Amino acid sequence: MSDRQQVTNSRGERIAIVAGLRTPFAKQATAFHGVSALDMGKMVVNELLSRSEIDPQLIEQLVYGQVVQMPAAPNIAREIVLGTGMNVSTDAYSVTRACATSFQSAVNVAESIMTGNIEIGLAGGSDSSSVLPIGVSKKLAHALVDLNKARTFKQKFAIARRLGLKDLMPVPPAVAEYSTGLSMGQTAEQMAKTYNISRADQDALAHRSHTLATETWNSGHLRNEVMTAHIPPYKQFIDRDNNIRENSVLESYAKLRPAFDRKHGTVTAANSTPLTDGASAIILMSEGRAKALGYQPIGYIKSYAFTAIDVWQDMLMGPSYATPLALKRAGMELEDLTLIEMHEAFAAQTLANMQMFGSKKFAEEKLGRNRAIGEIDMSKFNVLGGSLAYGHPFAATGTRLITQVCNELKRRGGGTGLATACAAGGLGAAMILEVE
């Protein structure tokens, strides 16, 4: 069996990405305070349909995701269909794969096109860290169920007496890995210690990310892939990511205290992504359908891969596992790539993966390869800045990366690019994109 992945339909047509768009990304409780993931999803999908000038009735499938689930609307994809101009009969379902969620939604639509079930689909993801599902304690939840079934005042009073004051306190969503109890920041600290990632190197990468993102915004490169978002009640708007330190000074990063290991740690708020609100989406078509409708694709999916590792130690190594598999399926090596775009959840996580890309020992022991994935050429790496600067609405990051890579390759006259990300649960995602 060939190792090559055939990302085509039965007619041999490639899977085309014809358009991509996102909202500006905003830090928690700022511009999108009070705006749900669903509302941001509808916002970006409506604008993408308008800008692309596609008839919404032609969209045959919508796959959309969120990580911080909304109990009131668990199938965010279907609600987006009902809240936009698409046909109510449009197939729509929701996915979640932690920080790789919109990689998954894009692949699901691509695979539907590959099988011939559809010709046109829309994929993306949205997350809000400002509109959160606040829970209750287990004891209160148990009591509420019992109260609902109690018939007499005496029964209800007996149930209420079981509760203490602390049982009535709201419970915010967990920021920890369910299986281990470790937060993502604690995992980043693990990785910094395992791979001897210094505080200085982490701060330098964060400074680089903010500096490049500032230059990218000032150059106008993001103008066509980031919409202006008008915030209900429509008295204000946001048209630019608000996490970017536009006057980043490297020396200032050293002033912050470690956030997760106060005594010996190196991971700080400045070299980590903040909690972020935002949404993104892309339109995919078969190559033939795109040409028939007069679209010039911004890129094509050449290969993709998803991987998983154990969650107890250094679980954010996903790019180091998914990338070689995606490259193998594309028939390529790392040095063949024009651009490399890696999600920067934390500077420590990013630097650890970069280090392992160049490690023959890691390749032999963990990947079963006789050569390293390859040393990363920094002139190709996150050339527009990364998530440390732009922010990270969990489910929206994948399709941001895909759109950004395709547009930058187009500006450079074409080539191939890697988009890759780590994700909670020890997951990894990688996608090879080609642009003519």
From Swiss-Prot:
<dbReference type="GO" id="GO:0005829">
    <property type="term" value="C:cytosol"/>
</dbReference>
<dbReference type="Pfam" id="PF00108">
    <property type="entry name" value="Thiolase_N"/>
</dbReference>
<dbReference type="InterPro" id="IPR020617">
    <property type="entry name" value="Thiolase_C"/>
</dbReference>
<dbReference type="InterPro" id="IPR020610">
    <property type="entry name" value="Thiolase_AS"/>
</dbReference>
<keyword id="KW-0012">Acyltransferase</keyword>
<comment type="subunit">
    <text>Heterotetramer of two alpha chains (FadJ) and two beta chains (FadI).</text>
</comment>
<keyword id="KW-0276">Fatty acid metabolism</keyword>
<comment type="function">
    <text>Catalyzes the final step of fatty acid oxidation in which acetyl-CoA is released and the CoA ester of a fatty acid two carbons shorter is formed.</text>
</comment>
<dbReference type="InterPro" id="IPR020616">
    <property type="entry name" value="Thiolase_N"/>
</dbReference>
<comment type="similarity">
    <text>Belongs to the thiolase-like superfamily. Thiolase family.</text>
</comment>
<dbReference type="InterPro" id="IPR016039">
    <property type="entry name" value="Thiolase-like"/>
</dbReference>
<feature type="active site" description="Acyl-thioester intermediate">
    <location>
        <position position="99"/>
    </location>
</feature>
<dbReference type="InterPro" id="IPR020613">
    <property type="entry name" value="Thiolase_CS"/>
</dbReference>
<keyword id="KW-0443">Lipid metabolism</keyword>
<comment type="pathway">
    <text>Lipid metabolism; fatty acid beta-oxidation.</text>
</comment>
<dbReference type="InterPro" id="IPR002155">
    <property type="entry name" value="Thiolase"/>
</dbReference>
<protein>
    <recommendedName>
        <fullName>3-ketoacyl-CoA thiolase</fullName>
        <ecNumber>2.3.1.16</ecNumber>
    </recommendedName>
</protein>
<feature type="active site" description="Proton acceptor">
    <location>
        <position position="392"/>
    </location>
</feature>
<keyword id="KW-0963">Cytoplasm</keyword>
<dbReference type="GO" id="GO:0003988">
    <property type="term" value="F:acetyl-CoA C-acyltransferase activity"/>
</dbReference>
<keyword id="KW-0442">Lipid degradation</keyword>
<dbReference type="InterPro" id="IPR012806">
    <property type="entry name" value="Ac-CoA_C-AcTrfase_FadI"/>
</dbReference>
<dbReference type="GO" id="GO:0006635">
    <property type="term" value="P:fatty acid beta-oxidation"/>
</dbReference>
<dbReference type="Pfam" id="PF02803">
    <property type="entry name" value="Thiolase_C"/>
</dbReference>
<feature type="active site" description="Proton acceptor">
    <location>
        <position position="422"/>
    </location>
</feature>
<keyword id="KW-0808">Transferase</keyword>
